[in-house]
Design a protein with these regions (language model features):
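Short hydrophobic/charged patches on amphipathic alpha-helices used for structural packing
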Residues: 45-48, 118-119
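Short, solvent-exposed loop/turn segments at secondary-structure boundaries
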Residues: 35-38, 71-72, 110
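Bacterial Sec-dependent N-terminal signal peptides
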Residues: 1-21
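Right-handed parallel beta-helix/beta-solenoid
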Residues: 18-46, 53, 63-65, 100
Length: 157
């Protein structure tokens, strides 16, 4: 009996690990691509539209010059550059990470929404993991509250 449970757990673990997908984003990518290492997406927005719990988005090295028209949303106070609203689970997080030893850099010098705080990564989803990338030149454009955020966590885990 214990042997059958162990074998079942082994195969279930293999099945679960097979269901996770790796997506890739690169400065030379195209959002009509499949999001693979050889044919990466161009934007995090496209990658986020595809991910499900357990998936990983690898961000290739290079400088991503973000433009204001690429912003995903906002409210009366904030402009969201990347609105990260999809959730992983406690057991199957969604990971956004720089690829291997490469260093992706998100340059926000051109994002200057008038009278708003800039939230580069506005995180409203839960069980998301971010690592191994830089965010530079985030602008402060609101006069009443001189604050902008690289990562703003809106109550997620």
């Amino acid at each position: 009996m214990k042997k059958h449970i162990g074998i079942s757990l082994f195969f279930m673990g293999c099945f679960l690990s097979l269901s996770a997908t790796n997506y890739f984003v690169a400065t030379n990518g195209d959002d009509s691509n499949a999001g693979t290492l050889d044919k990466p997406f161009a934007t995090l927005q496209k990658a986020q539209s595809k991910v499900v719990p357990g998936d990983t988005v690898y961000i290739r090295g290079g400088e991503y010059r973000i433009r204001e028209e690429q912003m995903m949303g906002g409210d009366h106070l904030r402009a969201y550059v990347f609105e990260m609203n999809k959730s992983g689970t406690q057991a199957k997080r969604i990971c956004y990470t720089g690829y291997q030893d490469e260093r992706p850099i998100f340059n926000l010098a051109e994002v200057k929404p008038e009278g708003k705080r800039v939230s580069v990564f506005y995180v409203s989803g839960s069980y998301l993991h971010f690592r191994n990338f830089e965010i530079i030149k985030t602008q402060v454009t609101i006069r009443e509250h001189t604050q902008s955020e690289c990562i703003y966590n809106q109550g997620g885990n």
